[in-house]
Each structure stands twice: as structure tokens, then as C-alpha cells.
């Protein structure tokens, strides 16, 4: 069974439309947005695990690199998985469930994870790689801490895709620095995802090239696309503009 066989059945047009409709709440109602994203992500990881390992995901440890406020914890717990969140920014950790008692969270950088080699079953990073200056150092750390036969799942926003500019909208096509300056003039403050400091241009090509170099890549697909549109990820050039978010699945 291929790693994506089960998830491909879930990757319908209805799912894509449902997730797209939630994106408008990212800034105004983060609990709603991230709650929906968390449920979808946990289902995706569970499907990938079951297909790749032919075992159930219950009882497996998930290390969420860049877990932020911790909205993903409950979604993984509902699937019987042991969740550990990693977040370097204390402001993010205190903005949601991560601040509640009983959670398992570690304050650390994704590019220098304080975990032993091969110590977790699944290492996940969702929409974080585009926010660090060296995303493949983060990726290498994820592979390092994942046990042999486990899964490292790295999902990130492609810069030239329609959501590459985050809250700056499509103005990122004018250039990242220019888009950030335009946002600042309009809103009176710098964007949270500020080009060059907290947002960087990460391409689909570079992600695929890095993943192939590890020798552990077993799947790559557009995260939010319906299955019938996954072919776009195989077309150089086109994928940079139409693959809004790329998922790289690695099995050390």
C-alpha cells in the first residue's frame, strides 16, 4: 500500500472547499480556524501512518514542531496518539490550549530539537518551514528525531502560491519586502508574517530537492488539493503557483 492511499480517499473537492472556507477566520477567530485545520491534519497523519506502516496510529508519539498555541493536541488525542508540542515563542504558547495545565509542551527551536535520535514515532511540522530562515535544517532535525520506520511529515506554504503572502494577500507577487511595506502603510503596523524576519520565500522545488537528498522521501503531494489535482505537484514551474501547500512525507 502506498503511503497516500488512505488519505487520497479523503482528499475530495468537498474537503478542499470546506477548508478554504475556514481560512477567512485565521485572524478573527483562530480557535475556529485552527480547530478545523487540526482535525484535518490529525486525520491526514493517521491515514499516512496506517498506510505506510500497516499498523494503527493509536499509542504513537507525535512531536509537533512549531505547535504554537497547541490547537492540534486535542485532535491527536482523539485518535489515541500521544502529543508533544514544540514552540520557541512563549507568546504563542500562552495564546491557546498550550497554556492549560496537563499539556505536554516544550519551549525549543525546531532547528535544534532537544530530543534524542530516533525518539518519536511521528514528527510533524505544519505551516512552519516558511517562517524560519533555514527550513531544511528544520527538516533534517525532524528526520533525526524520527525513529526508523516512523514518519516525518513536513507541510509548508509555497511562496509563489496564492497564500504565500499570508495576511499580505496577493501583494507578495510584487515582492516580499514591497508587500510588507504596503501592508504597514495600510494598517499602521508590520505584518505578523513579515517578509525577511518571520516569513521567507520557500519553493516547492527546493522542498522536493531537499527531501530527495535525504533518501527517505516516500510521498509528496499538495495538502489542500483534491486527489484529482495532485498531478500539479509533478510539473516544474506550474507547481510553484498552484500548489499552495506542499506535504513531504519521509520514512527514515
UniProtKB/Swiss-Prot annotation:
It is an enzyme of class 2 (transferase). GO terms for molecular function: S-adenosylmethionine-dependent methyltransferase activity. The keyword Methyltransferase applies. Keywords: Methyltransferase, Transferase. One of its GO terms (biological process) is methylation. CDD domains: AdoMet_MTases (cd02440). Its EC number is 2.1.1.-. Belongs to the methyltransferase superfamily. This is Uncharacterized methyltransferase Mjls_0208. It comes from Mycobacterium sp. (strain JLS).
Amino acid at each position: 500500500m502506498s503511503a497516500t492511499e488512505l488519505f487520497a480517499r479523503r482528499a475530495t473537492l468537498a474537503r478542499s472547499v470546506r477548508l478554504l472556507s475556514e481560512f477567512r477566520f485565521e485572524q478573527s477567530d483562530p480557535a475556529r480556524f485552527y480547530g478545523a485545520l487540526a482535525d484535518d491534519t490529525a486525520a491526514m497523519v493517521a491515514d499516512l501512518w496506517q498506510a505506510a506502516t500497516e499498523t494503527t496510529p493509536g499509542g504513537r508519539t507525535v512531536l509537533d514542531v512549531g505547535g504554537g498555541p497547541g490547537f492540534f493536541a486535542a485532535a491527536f488525542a482523539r485518535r489515541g496518539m500521544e502529543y508533544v508540542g514544540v514552540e520557541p515563542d512563549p507568546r504563542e504558547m500562552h495564546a491557546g490550549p498550550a497554556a492549560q495545565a496537563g499539556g505536554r509542551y516544550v519551549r525549543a527551536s525546531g532547528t535544534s530539537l532537544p530530543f534524542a535520535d530516533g525518539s518519536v514515532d511521528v514528527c510533524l511540522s505544519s505551516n512552519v518551514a516558511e517562517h524560519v530562515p533555514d527550513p531544511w535544517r528544520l527538516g533534517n532535525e525532524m528526520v533525526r528525531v524520527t525513529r526508523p520506520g516512523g514518519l516525518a511529515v513536513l507541510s509548508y506554504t509555497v511562496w509563489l502560491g496564492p497564500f504565500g503572502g499570508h495576511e499580505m494577500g496577493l501583494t507578495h507577487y510584487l515582492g516580499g519586502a514591497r508587500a510588507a511595506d504596503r501592508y504597514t502603510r495600510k494598517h499602521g503596523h508590520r505584518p505578523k508574517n513579515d517578509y525577511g524576519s518571520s516569513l521567507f520565500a520557500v519553493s516547492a522545488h527546493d522542498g522536493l530537492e531537499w527531501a530527495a537528498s535525504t533518501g527517505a522521501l516516500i510521498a509528496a503531494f499538495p495538502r489542500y488539493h483534491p486527489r484529482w489535482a495532485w498531478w500539479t505537484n509533478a510539473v516544474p514551474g506550474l507547481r510553484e503557483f498552484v500548489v499552495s501547500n506542499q506535504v513531504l512525507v519521509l520514512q527514515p
